[in-house]
Design a protein with these regions (language model features):
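Conserved AdoMet/S-adenosylmethionine-binding subsite of the radical SAM
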Residues: 1-137, 145
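Auxiliary Fe-S-binding modules of radical SAM enzymes
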Residues: 96-208
Length: 208
């Protein structure tokens, strides 16, 4: 459920998710996470995985650009994680607006403290669109954010760019490549039966 904010029509998503669950299909929700506790409580039992877009750790950014607030988004992310859903976080890096290293590190620290080092973080490049005319995110900014976040999180990825880093899934213990990615090509290269081929650590991947 994605590409428009699905929780605008939360009743529709709930109906579809229930039907999908009856057919043994997985429900994956991509959302900005701006939802109150009670409706989230009702729908989360039917959701298998979420990607939550935390746009900045600066509440002023949310109020200026999103006309909303940061706290409800963080509360939902924690609620989703505590409910047992698989949670991943995305942060769109926008030059001059939310690319400050201190703010980026605050996000990684919050994820690590509240959900653990194993929660994946996707750092995505911004592109000019509609009324937002700032220049596209430089690769250097994303790679700098990657280095900052990797101090706190084991799985950090770069999105919307071609980069030598932040593409593959690597074993946190030995550094071996578990899943290699090139564009939309994805190959399980270093894991077998749920374990790293090199060090035999159990991999943090859900296989279905």
């Amino acid at each position: 459920y994605t590409y428009n904010e699905p929780l605008i029509g939360i009743e529709f998503v709930e109906d579809c998710a229930r039907l999908a669950r009856d057919k043994n299909l997985a429900n994956v929700l991509v959302t900005n996470g701006y939802v109150e506790h009670e409706p989230a409580r009702d729908i989360l039992p039917m959701i298998d995985a979420l990607n939550i877009d935390i746009k900045s750790m600066d509440d002023a950014f949310y109020r200026r650009w999103c006309k909303s607030q940061l706290a409800p988004v963080l509360a939902f992310a924690k609620q989703a994680f505590d409910s047992g859903c698989h949670v991943e976080i995305t942060n769109l890096i926008i030059p001059t607006l939310n690319d400050d290293g201190i703010v980026v590190e605050r996000l990684a620290e919050w994820i690590s403290k509240n959900m653990g080092r194993l929660v994946p973080l996707h750092l995505s490049a911004y592109r000019p669109q509609y009324k937002m005319c700032l220049n596209a995110t430089p690769l250097e900014s994303l790679e700098r954010a990657y280095d900052i976040c990797r101090k706190h999180l084991d799985y950090v990825y770069l999105g919307n760019v071609w980069s030598e880093i932040g593409q593959d899934t690597v074993c946190p213990l030995c550094g071996a490549v578990l899943i290699s990615r090139q564009g939309y090509s994805v190959n399980i290269t270093g894991a077998d039966k749920g374990y790293c081929n090199n060090c035999r650590r159990k991999v943090d991947i859900i296989f279905r």
